Amino acid sequence: MKWLASIGLSGTVLALFAAITSVAIGWTYLGTKAQIDFEVRRAEARQLLEIFPPETHDNEIVDDVFEVAAETALLGIRERRQGYRVRQGDTVVGVILPATARDGYSGDIRALVGVRRDGSVAGVRVVAHRETPGLGDKVDLRKSDWILDFNERSLNNPALNGWNVEKEGGVFDQFTGATVTPRAVILATRRAIEYATLNASTLFETEADSA
């Protein structure tokens, strides 16, 4: 019967080892997930502050969120996303909206569009894309400063027909060998401004307004 006892002991040891391993893996996962969440949040905050620098507001933009419904046509988003409010004291001075250009050359181009209370653009940043390296990827600020041409633009600057690449009668530069990508970002930005304008009473509402 010693061999039965030995088997029983071995089974107990294996079960104990498996339990300890599972706990260790669980703790490792939680620790890794926490680190990943922290890094994602830090990157997100950095992008928001590129659009509205610290001197333009006194709130933590990354924490001042509102929900944007899925399938919001003007923003091009398919799933529910978050937008951000930018405040100075009790005044909402701007918003940062999620926008997706569905007509990129290689698929969706996701961006953040900052719009001030007066309807002017504070900044635009492309946060995800699959555009061709060396061509369409110039929408990324790390590749070129093309995206900065949106700064201070509005629905009146330029007029509606100016929101296109120069090749098609607009005021924005196209890329050599790539017209589809910049045009997609241009139109997505314009639509985001239109969304902000149409929903200004809600987006820029203060606590005093809602009281």
Which residue ranges define each predicted feature?
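Flexible, solvent-exposed loop/hinge segments and secondary-structure transition points
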Residues: 1-211
